[in-house]
């Protein structure tokens, strides 16, 4: 059997996360060998480094427990900064970032799944976030102008991309000079077996 194409992988990921958003389902820690653990999203978030204050400050429906760490811990976000979140999902990290950068700061969430973007936009409107913008797009081709961001964050998303170098090329393009990145993700430390390469669930986190 041939390896899955880049298009196939994107389609699988888009469908998988679209179903999660549409079903209002809770996910699982993507670092758990691709098994969806049954804990609540809040418990998952607490276990991967989010404080109780962060969990309570963000809209509850934005937190689906899909991350594998807390990029906010290393982002050191400052007032008035512009932040881009790669693979923003329901908007959990974006809403936290919006509070930290304040009313004169700005947060842009990028996600390729229409259902996730719709969910995040509804939550943003419901909770009256005025400094957050959710955009539909692929992280390999960001719908953002050059030299836009002071900080780029991402939580367990880049591993889902079949073209990781393109992602980092885009990061470099949209970052301002002196900008920084804060990424929580999983990495491959040894070659996957042929059986694993054909397992669609692995490509979906």
What are these regions (language model features)?
Residues 1-44:
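N-terminal auxiliary segments of SAM/dcSAM-dependent transferases
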Residues 36-82, 93-100:
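Conserved alpha-helix/loop element of class I SAM-dependent methyltransferases that forms part
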Residues 79, 140-151:
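A short acidic, Gly/Pro-enriched loop at the edge of an enzyme's catalytic core
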Residues 83, 152-153:
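Hydrophobic beta-strand segment of the Class I
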Residues 113-115:
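Conserved SAM/SAH-binding beta-strand->alpha-helix loop
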Residues 127-140:
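Conserved SAM-binding strand-loop segment of SAM-dependent methyltransferases
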Residues 165-180:
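A short glycine-rich, Lys/Arg-flanked "PGG" loop and its adjoining helix->strand segment in the class I
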Residues 187-205:
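Short, glycine-/aromatic-enriched active-site segment of Class I SAM-dependent methyltransferases
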């Amino acid at each position: 059997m041939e390896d899955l194409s880049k298009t196939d992988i994107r389609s699988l990921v888009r469908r998988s996360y679209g179903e999660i958003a549409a079903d209002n389902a809770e996910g699982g820690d993507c670092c758990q060998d691709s098994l969806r653990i049954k804990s609540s999203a809040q418990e998952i978030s607490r276990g991967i480094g989010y404080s109780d204050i962060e969990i309570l400050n963000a809209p509850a429906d934005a937190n689906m427990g899909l991350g594998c760490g807390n990029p906010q811990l290393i982002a050191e976000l400052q007032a008035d900064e512009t932040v881009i979140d790669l693979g923003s999902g329901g908007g959990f990290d974006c809403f936290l970032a919006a509070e930290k950068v304040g009313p004169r700061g700005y947060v842009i969430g990028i996600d390729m799944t229409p259902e996730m973007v719709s969910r995040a936009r509804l939550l943003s409107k419901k909770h009256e976030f005025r400094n957050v913008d959710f955009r539909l797009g692929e992280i390999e081709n960001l719908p953002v102008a050059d030299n836009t961001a002071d900080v780029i964050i991402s939580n367990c998303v880049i591993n889902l991309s079949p073209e990781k170098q393109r992602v980092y090329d885009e990061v470099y393009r949209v970052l301002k000079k002196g900008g920084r990145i804060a990424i929580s993700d999983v990495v491959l430390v040894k070659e996957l077996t042929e059986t694993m390469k054909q397992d669609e669930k692995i490509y979906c986190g």
